[in-house]
Amino acid sequence: MRSARYFVAFLGAFAVLLAACSGGQQPAGGGSASPSAGTKATYGGSITFGLENDVSNLDPMLSGLFVDRNIMYAMYDSLVRVTPKGDIIPWLADKWETSSDGKTVTFTLRTDVKYHDGTAFDADSVKWNIERYKTTQGSLRTADLASVDSVTVVDAKTVKFNLKSAFAPLLGALVDRAGMMVSKAVQTAVGADFTLKPFKAGTGPFILAEAVKGDHYTLEKNPNWWGKDKDGSKLPYLDKITVRPITDADVALTNLRTGNAQVLNRINGKDVAAVKADSTLSYLEVGSFSWNSLVPNEAPGFIFSDHRYVKAVAMALDRDEILQSGPAAGIGLVGWGPISPAHFAYDASFKPWPKADPDGAKKLIADVGKGPLKFELLVPSGDAGILQAAQLIKSELAKADITMDLKTQTLNEIVAIQQKHQHLGMTFVGWSGRLDPDGNTYDFVVTGSPNNDSSYSNKQVDDLMAQQRAESDPAKRKQLLLQAQQIYTVDDPSRVWYGFGVSPLITVKNLVGMESYPDRIPRFQAASLQK
């Protein structure tokens, strides 16, 4: 089992970033790694990226899966981005400034950007995107942008976000899908098909040219992208990226070794040592924001509407065994909540159940007075490692006389059931993580939020989470986040968290210019194939 030292400690809070005026010279290549010293980048070439599951939605407004973002980061630019070290940097927004009361954030935009369809990226486009994300029924970005009262166009390159109150996590939200800009012309013309066929809709380094669900997605070089490398040469270098869903991690690694793929961003722990020793492959790893969980349905009428059952499952888990014996062995860290060691608000002393407590779980179930606990766990199909982890959890729960039946379905099917709050017991679904702890917590525990698939509701948690969003002092904000965590993980649990991941990046040796990011999403704009 890994210690916390394997995780990047990110210093500073977004409140500090928001309070400052940011700007200055754009990092070369958007802050991406250049080829190593002595290795000259070369233009051209095509690669295949083995994605762990098929995408569900390529509209940033409606996307709820990690796999979607792997393609989105190549085709869409966002207003700001993050470096591998966790620093927020200018992207489509060249600089920004926040008012003294924290209620107005003014962004100055790049003027050398066009969408792939040739239409202009400007302040009007930003306003349209943010308002679309905020007001469209079914949008999954509403919580990210809840603090934004209105957006004002000052001029073509200046846009002002008027906030209801100071909002510490705003920049962190704008790094990801809430800050991704899409072409109004394309989205309006395509309509319902935009979810999986947003061709020429972004401004990013690659253009989505083909989308065959379940088989492949083709990204072609954007010759007009604004990014440059450290020497001032145009990016990207690659001509084409083919993204293929490969659900089984072992099969994906075989594809990498046989030349049928050149990039992966997941691996079973048992394979790490061999990959590191393979002279034909490169292995990079950094700490992650991601967490693993079991998601109960706490809606009225379902088994876990009595939260004592959720707590019993959490108590019965042997987290050390899962992280030592399961498929994550060697590449994970035990955890009890969603705030990871990579977050400023992490509390290393938070260990409500340092060891599995099956006897305590039995007593809690007996207190409910309805007999033994039995439920169904929905497990994503296609990956033997995931099923192995679920079987290990099943055996651990049996020690507390808890019966857990396993049912496999595709990840997209499970998420659809989960989002409709129709799962009978629990689902085996985690989260890829966000830079600010608000992105790892708020949407999952606040009443009615878009990712609150457990139907959890606790007024005290709602109040604490609202307070931390408005708090500008990082130390005070941390305490509010930790108070809320104690409630939604222990006192009145919303789901069962059991560990954190790492962010691996595995490539063929002659693919250079890539770095591993804590969100586990590959950045391809500076990737280069050495011939």
What are these regions (language model features)?
Residues 108, 143-186, 207-212:
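Surface-exposed binding/hinge segments that line
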